[in-house]
Amino acid sequence: IKNAQYRYIDHLASFIPSKTKTILDVGCGIGGNTSFLLKKGYSLEALSPDSYQKSVIKEKFNRDVTFHHCKFENFKPETLFDLIFESESVCYIDIDKGFKKAREALKEGGYLLASDYFVFFKDHSNSLHFKSSHDMDTYLNSAKENGFNLIKQYDQTENTMLTLDYANYFIERFI
């Protein structure tokens, strides 16, 4: 799974525009993506409302990364960013408030790179995926209404399903 995570962030990083220097990692977790992007030479700030993640980030990066302990919707940017990076954190952000905050935190001509799982269909399912994801059409419409233009859309499903299926098999068999 660790190798799959590395391939995933490496793939996401390929979408970062070449002129990007400053990145805000929204929903940074314990800093895997932050660490990867720092090694690529970007200037990073990280954000999470989680206290445990705050302690890990502070210990892991010391003063190399400014950490913002808040929800993205409540973030008060002191600087503007070339790119806002949301990897597997989109589903925790209120759609309209998130786009408004992204607009506020980005430099003119800045980018929002959002990667998460979205609901593409309405099957009235009770699955956790259905309950914890944003509807893709609603998300894209809000992006447009908030002045964002879709540059690239990529469906990662085929590349991730084998890993997810294996993890599910492992859990069901051994746990």
What are these regions (language model features)?
Residues 152-175:
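Conserved catalytic loop of SAM-dependent methyltransferase domains
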Residues 24, 28-73:
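Class I SAM-dependent methyltransferase SAM/SAH-binding core
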Residues 74-84:
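A short acidic, Gly/Pro-enriched loop at the edge of an enzyme's catalytic core
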